[in-house]
A protein has these predicted regions:
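An N-terminally biased module of ancient metal coordination in phosphate/nucleic-acid-related enzymes
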Residues: 1-78
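Extended substrate/RNA-proximal surfaces in nucleic-acid metabolism proteins
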Residues: 54-142
Length: 142
């Protein structure tokens, strides 16, 4: 569908642009309908909606939810990302996403702890400082 992008990320999760910058860049490319689908957070939605007003752009609420799927026959766990669009009752979802933020922060701490023997110091606080005072948004930018 021309002019529609239903899977985007801002710097609220693992993108590089702020929601406002993302909307502006999308508008420059001729996008008129955009879904902000940050990983495990909808914190950028209001910012995107506000920015979209000056571009006559429609914003669709969205989120990319990280989950695990277990295959019983192999006893292996697989990471699965599910993109949810245009949700209505958001309260239960917000509770789930808050848990995901805590899991991400713990994962970042575990990674930093594994690095201590290699580099000789705990860099967790430095990592948090580098993510612009957003410790609940420690992600792998792509």
């Amino acid at each position: 569908m021309e002019g529609v992008d239903l899977h985007t990320h801002s710097n609220i999760s693992d993108g590089t642009f702020t929601p406002k910058q993302l909307v502006a860049a999308a508008a420059e490319k001729g996008i008129h309908t955009l879904a902000l689908t940050d990983h495990d957070t909808m914190d950028g939605l209001a910012l995107a909606e506000s920015a979209a007003k000056s571009h006559a752009m429609r914003i669709i609420s969205g989120v990319e939810i990280s989950s695990q799927w277990s295959r019983p026959s192999t006893q292996k766990n697989y990471g699965v990302h599910v993109v949810a669009l245009n949700m209505q009752d958001l309260e239960p979802l917000h509770k789930c996403l808050e848990q995901q933020k805590q899991i991400r922060a713990r994962r970042a701490k575990q990674i930093c702890d594994l690095l201590i023997p290699l580099i000789g110091e705990d860099i967790y606080l430095d990592v948090l400082a580098k993510v612009e005072q957003m410790p609940d948004r420690v992600t792998r930018t792509h």
